[in-house]
Design a protein with these regions (language model features):
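Blade-edge motifs of beta-propeller repeat domains
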Residues: 6-56, 101-115
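Sec-dependent signal peptide cleavage junction
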Residues: 1-5
Length: 227
């Protein structure tokens, strides 16, 4: 019987991810933030500030999806924008956590001024900025060790009497560490919009169902075809 119980037990990463989701549930439900991770809470706090408890529990979602390609899924928490049939879907991601070195590690977060979305090739795209003169588009990929590898970063920066678009392969949004492009601001904004349009929908489970459902009900999309 013990062997059977062990076989049916959830993987360690799933047990640890459940603690994170439970902390988010507690925070949305009654404001308890004692167990809420320090990193990855910005967007979640925004939701609690502008939405009612009931709406937040319905619109915040969670799922497991392997976006690093190492066979172990990441935990994604995001915003459910629509329901189709029995599924709940959304593009916006508020927090991503991975499981590496036998523990949960923070990866990235999104919020109202810094949109975080997933592409079909599992790249992560961040579109944000600190104002009209400094807008950013970052394309990154999660490595198996839990770190983010930077593919490219574009950003605007004041130059002379206007704005210039820069490109940096190290994801540092500083003009002196980047290469000036001949891209116009309009072209840059079009590129940002194109990434947003091409980002993928994520199927989430509503946070309101976590206590009774946990991770059951996921299509186990994070498992390989042979798993």
């Amino acid at each position: 019987p013990k062997t059977e119980a062990a076989a049916k037990a959830a993987p360690v990463y799933e047990q640890e991810y459940a603690k994170v989701v439970d902390s988010v549930y507690e925070f949305i439900s009654d404001g308890t933030s004692d167990n809420l991770p320090e990193q990855g809470r910005t967007g979640i706090c925004e939701v609690r500030n502008f939405a009612s408890r009931e709406a937040a529990l319905q619109q915040l979602g969670y799922t497991l999806q392997d976006i690093s390609g190492d066979g172990v899924p990441e935990l994604l928490i995001g915003w459910i924008s629509q329901k189709r049939g029995v599924g709940h879907y959304g593009k916006e991601i508020y927090a991503i956590y991975t499981f590496a070195d036998d523990r949960v590690k923070y990866v990235a977060e999104g919020w109202s001024r810094s949109s975080l979305q997933l592409m079909a090739n599992d790249n992560l795209v961040t579109r944000g900025g600190t104002g009209i003169s400094h807008q950013v588009l970052a394309v990154e990929h999660l490595q198996p060790d839990g770190s983010l590898g930077c593919y490219e970063l574009y950003f605007t920066w004041p130059k002379d009497d206007g704005l210039c678009v820069y490109r940096n392969m190290n994801c540092r949004s500083e003009a002196d560490a980047a290469q000036e492009t001949d891209m116009t601001v309009e072209e840059f904004n079009e590129m940002r919009s194109e990434y947003a349009n091409n980002s993928v929908e994520i199927e989430y489970l509503p946070l309101k169902d976590f206590k009774k459902q946990g991770f059951k009900g996921l299509m186990r999309q994070y498992l390989s075809a042979g798993g």
